[in-house]
Amino acid sequence: MSLRKKLTHKIMPSPVDARHYEYSMLFSADDEPAKPSQRLIDLALESAKVASTTSLDDIAARTLPENYLDVWPGEHYKLLAGIVQVLKPKLVIEIGTAKGLSSLSMKKFLAQDAMIVTYDIISWKDYPNGNYLTEADFKDGRLIQYTDDLSSVDIFRKHSDLLSKADLIFADAAKDGMQEQLFINNFKQLKFANSPIVVFDDIRLWNMLKIWRDLDLPKLDITSFGHWSGTGLVDWK
């Protein structure tokens, strides 16, 4: 924990007991630089409804006894699965493979002719503290991982043909106050074949507040139906 974080915790201790807490800030809505599109509102409502009846029991079984996959609302896995069922994307791009639970949650509900391409700077096989993915998850060719950093302009260009075909993008990366902004800058230079939906994780974390607030595209905070640390939808036009 950084010195700044330690001091903040000491000066402003949490008013409640919780397993995990983060500091954030609230902002007025009337001067928000971007408003949600009707497409986002419809997608959010339909996806939340589908998420409420979605089962991820088979994937959750991989995580036992540490099962938080079924925590909904509160975690975003069922919401991501709901979005896939409603949107029916042909190509999903994930930025930040991590332990693979988001990939698995989305892949379960993809059409047979659809696929997920997930990016991380670390191979899933080498991810610290293990991974929930197995070789079998990649066998049908509908899940592919590239160990590349899409915040790099040169690497982004290398994958631009593939990225331009995305229907759904899920960004769950460093949240360091810089990387997600670099993703946004790179995506703004790309001509998408469709208008993808972009899902940003952790938008209420301190380092993500300015990035989310400054994003000048149709957007919607759906944290109540997603991740407790923040989930945002963007209608990338």
Positions of predicted regions on the chain:
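S-adenosylmethionine/decaboxylated-SAM
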Residues: 66-71, 77-237
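A glycine-rich, hydrophobic loop/mini-helix early in the fold
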Residues: 44-63, 67-71, 83
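Residues that form generic nucleotide/phosphate-binding pockets
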Residues: 6, 10, 43, 62, ...
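Short charge-dense sequence patches
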Residues: 23-35, 49-58, 96, 104, ...
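Membrane-proximal basic amphipathic "stem/tether" segments
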Residues: 1-52, 57
